Amino acid sequence: MTRSHRRDRKKKRLLYGAAAAVVATATIGTLAVASPGLLGAAGDGTAAGDVSLQSQFANAAREFDVPQSVLMAVSYQQTRWESHDGEPSTTGAYNVMGLTKVDPEDVPQKVTDEQIDHFNGSGRPEIEKTFDRAKVRQILEKALVDTDDPRLHTLDKAAELIDSSSEAVQNDTAASIRAGAALLADYQKQAGAELSDEAGDWYPAVARYSQSPEKKGADLFAKRVFESIQEGERAVTLDGEQVALPADPSVEPVKPSNVPLAATPASTRAAAAVPECPAGLSCNVKLTVPDSAGKKNYTAADRPNQGLDIRQIVIHDTEGGYDGSLQVLTDPNGGGSAHYLIRAADGLVTQMLENKNLAWHAGNWTHNMHAIGVEHEGYAIKEGSWYTEQQYRSSAELVKFLANKYGVPIDREHIIGHDEVALQTDAGLANLHWDAGPYWDWNYYMSLLGAPQGDKGAGGLLRAGQVVRVVPPFTTANQPKLTVGGTAVSARPANFGYLYTTPSTGGTPLKDPYFTSGPSEGSNYGNKVRAGGTYVVAEARTDWTAIWYAGQKAWFFNPGGQYTAPVTGATTVKVAGLTAVKVFGRSFPETAAYTAAGLSAPGDENASLTKFSFAAGQSYVKAGPAVKGDDWFGSAQKNVVGTTLFVPIRFHHKIVWVKQSEITEAPGAAPVSATDRYNLIARDASGVLWQYQGTGSGSTPFLTRYRVGPGWQDYDAVTPMTALRADGTGDMVARGKDGVLWYYKGTGKPSAPFAGRLRVGGGWGVYDKLLGARDMNADGRPDLIARDKTGVLWLYTNTGAAPNPFATRVRVGGGWNTYNELISTGDMTGDGRPDLIARDKTGVLWLYKNTGGTPNPYATRAKVGGGWNAYDVMVGPSDLDRDGRPDLIARDTTGVLWFYKNTNGYPNPYAPRVSVGGGWKGYNLIV
């Protein structure tokens, strides 16, 4: 590369950094809700040595001559820029670049009974009798993970390229990014391609980075990487870092005639067939076929005909490597099957069974009849804690296609994990499985399906009878203790919350009558509420919620309601009479239906789950329409359909059935109103803004805080223009240290309360106090008052214009510098006009009644009382106890917050103070 070429390249990178800064500005109020800017972006003026991911990508790209967009897009498609604290994926990928390291001690060196049991999924006793465990073991032993495979040691290779240790690349983001950049450059050179400054020229390296041994997989990964480059990506990582990849629609990938592929000792090629798959996935097909004796590992059918409609899609993991799983699932002697298998490294989808046929995957015949099974590679590497981005994306694309094709609702009652498949009968406990397990990110997965679950929301009050979706965050805020075989695993984000018999972590863990394992065991889901499930609230307290769960009132930690999302339009189910009704693990027809069809009944067709009961007074969410009990006979190609109607319900972690004749249906209770509750906003020392949602109770006026966004330290004044309601309404203005005023309009969304800021204008640095005064002139718009440094008070009426809504200022009067605090409280006197509270330097509080006059709207002050200099913050959030009168909040110098109830007295309207609680000293702004 010539010296001038390198200068041009450097110039382009500087421009790229500027583009990142532009993206940062464009994300105000969107990427991080109401954040004034994206910190740590390339070109944002951060000091040299900055350790932000954005800077690490820029530095590594420069060092190894890799376009930064390529490096960032590859990382995003591997891990979404997550480090996972150095923990491996379920297939041995590490850190932000997804580099692999799998040694012999990381994977089972022999086939376990649990692996074999995973393939015994027919749920049919006569089929289970023929399950050949020895044959399955034999197949799996031939396909044990080859830890000498270079595809499983990209981390070691990349570490060598940067002369670093494997441990550093595993655990340090900067080392991981440098190693990934070096490996991309190495792959580009191996392909005989130039280290071009054009992103589109890097197709060979990107495809090779996928570690796919097949062209379809390599092309799929490259396609997604270049889509990220063209469309841009942005994210806030679990560590709280904001990262942005600016969109560059001009990039056109240059695909070589021979796409570089990873070498593999034994690559299984697909048969020539047309897959039932979206075109963009370019799926493989390797169908299981009967052997010469006619033995097969599935049941032939003609779905969705003959009443065999497809109602659900079941998510599995393989508990083994890709090659071994593919061999077992396509071997007619394997005993188990599934419709699809998704490889971890590149997201390649292989169809193994036509969807018209019944796969033996769920261990429950009703689910097998009416569901499609999708397996995901995962071979239980020690400490494996996350699934690859390519698996998530391919799976979501496939499942969305299948759901649309077969009319399957895209919700968590129809897109379920294997662990949510019901126990068929009391005798079927051995058929239960717990994949996809606690580390499958259901919240993210459902968002890829276009059905966001409402996780990471602001929460709110709940009431009994209300339907909620449980959405614990898949972040470091939710890292419950887990054990496997009694051995603790390291803390990491998980997709569940623990259930207790009382609202306390010190309470007794919930017990499932069918489980004997310890409550912290990952396989014991009887005391765990999984993300995405919908339940009926049995009781609600501030930070704890009880739901009806498996015949019990089960409590889980739900800070401020933030681990749930209200569900509207849901139907609840209750017992019709006073007597408890049976719960069924499958929906089989009544005995008479078999007789009428001329087929033999199984003998346990009427069996229920006897250790469960659905009692009067309890309530559960209906999980689908009522269906007639049915039972498919593959040998006769006939579906036995009964007359008894069964209703699926979310009874506990699983979907079960009750007889329609024994229950009644009703809508869930309406959500608690948020229009008569008011919030408090606080800023911590790092500049993060927090929202405290009002409860409407004077004794406990606020719910657990909710993070609005970072970057607010750049403002030296912030004031609400109106009361900030719990429903996300209410505007705010903020002044930068440069004197520029910005307007934040309320969105009406509690989880994203402010829209992107609007620039009002400069010159506001002349004021030492800005105060949103509510609607001063009864025109329906909130106004602003400002005090200049000489003590003159000015009124800015709101015209409704944008971006500057304020009319020319009007002088209210002088002498206001005698006060060291001005407080906007709203209407204190009941005349419909907003009043003003002021504290003088001796600690006396004064009330200024609004007369409606102009230009000075305030009457002669009235003395409230002395002693108020004990407080360093006083604000008037509005009516906090729902009695129709605005109250006062004050923080003393020790950090204790106090509530002053408005009694409607005059001139002193306040009752004796009530402590809200301590710990508020960490905030440098409360409004």
Where are these regions (language model features)?
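N-terminal export and membrane-targeting signals
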Residues: 2-22
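C-terminal region of N-terminal signal peptides and the immediate post-cleavage residues
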Residues: 13-16, 28-49, 233, 237, ...
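N-terminal catalytic cores of peptidoglycan-degrading enzymes
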Residues: 47-52, 241-363, 552, 558-560, ...
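Catalytic glycan-binding domains that act on GlcNAc-containing polysaccharides
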Residues: 48-231
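Basic/polar, cationic surfaces and motifs that engage anionic cell-wall
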Residues: 215, 221-281, 285-287, 383-492
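SH3/SH3-like beta-barrel superfamily modules
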Residues: 527-559, 610-666
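Intrinsically disordered, low-complexity linker and terminal regions at domain boundaries
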Residues: 559-601
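Trp/Gly-enriched beta-strand/coil motifs that build multi-repeat beta-propeller-like domains
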Residues: 669-927
